[in-house]
Amino acid sequence: MSDKQKIKFLLGSNTKMGFIPLFDELRDPLNSKRLYILKGGPGSGKSSLMKRVSKVLEDKNHSLEYIHCASDPGSLDAFIDYDAGIAMVDGTAPHIMDPKYPGAYDVIINMADCWDDMTLIQHKNEIIPLSDIISSCHQMATSCISSAAALLDSNMHFSKAYVKHDTVNDFIAKLTKKLEGSKTGKLKKRLLSAVSVGETIFFDETIEVLSKSIYVIPDIWGAASDALLSELHRMASILEIEQILCYCSIRTPDKIDHIIFPSAGITVTTANSFHRLKDKKNIVIPDLMSPIPHIIEEQMSIHLNRANELIDMACEHIKRAKLLHDDLEAFYVNAMDFSKVDSIFNNIIKEIQ
């Protein structure tokens, strides 16, 4: 894989039910060698350490998958190296992970060993309220997301009656034939999008990297994509075809937005106001919906506009949380001895090699 072909996903995001983590997807003790679980506070160098280690592996042309942070897309929450058989993850809140097979498979790397407690204790009265305000910002974002999801779910419910199931079933039958003979493998669960810092993010480049053929479901109401992708997932599961299931980031795990079949080089993806695909070479799946009566469509449009406004509000709350988180990180950065982080890095590289 070349440097430009980076595979990027998320394994958690703010949803209508709060933060839902999918980080157990990283555990594969029977087929991989090691899961490194990083513990420590903000600014303790967890993401930077992962970037340093993954860069060494990337330079060796290893096959890597990067898991980004929904609340700070420039940071890593985890990465997987399929060639070395290792994964590394930030195991702190909100995606707490602990070893299941301590030492034998997973191991804790304690970044707190690299900081000076007394420096942090001196700033206790600043750290505690700042941490609490950040939590409140995320709670407010969740409130907005929950309200937006309720409106989008309502639209999906009212538009279900207008889905052309014959067209859906015909497409699935044709695609299933193309998938026959594809590699069998386990189901992977991922996210490609998230409500993030001041905007929604969508890793459409991952679809481009993993796909030769991209089928697009144009679906602002959600019902057509829900019907098609749910049934396609069911059929692919019966055939035990390797698939990467990507959920709607605010309705995880209730709604599927994209399915990637990596061995076949085929993706079926949903295009809407939250994730648009730019490539004109994509194959649009036509005629999935019957006309919706104007009065119903008018009301659903109001719902969609309000949902967009609420998502924008959630993005602003997350942006505020990120700015405050930067302030919080500064306290920990000042307390860190990064020469100790260098020692941790060197030990990990020795073990991997």
Region locations from a protein language model:
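Charged, compositionally biased non-catalytic regions
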Residues: P21, P29-K33, G41
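Glycine-rich phosphate-binding P-loop
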Residues: L35-S54, F203-D204, L210-A236
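N-terminal pre-Walker A segment at the start of P-loop NTPase domains
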Residues: M1-R27, D166-I207
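A cross-family "folded-core" feature that marks the main globular domain of proteins
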Residues: L38-K39, L49-R52, L57, E65-A70, ...
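Short secondary-structure boundary/capping segments within folded domains
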Residues: R27-D28, A78
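Conserved nucleotide-sensing/catalytic segment adjacent to the nucleotide-binding pocket
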Residues: S2-I20, K55-T119, N125-E126, A236-C315
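GST-like fold's C-terminal all-alpha helical module
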Residues: I349-Q353
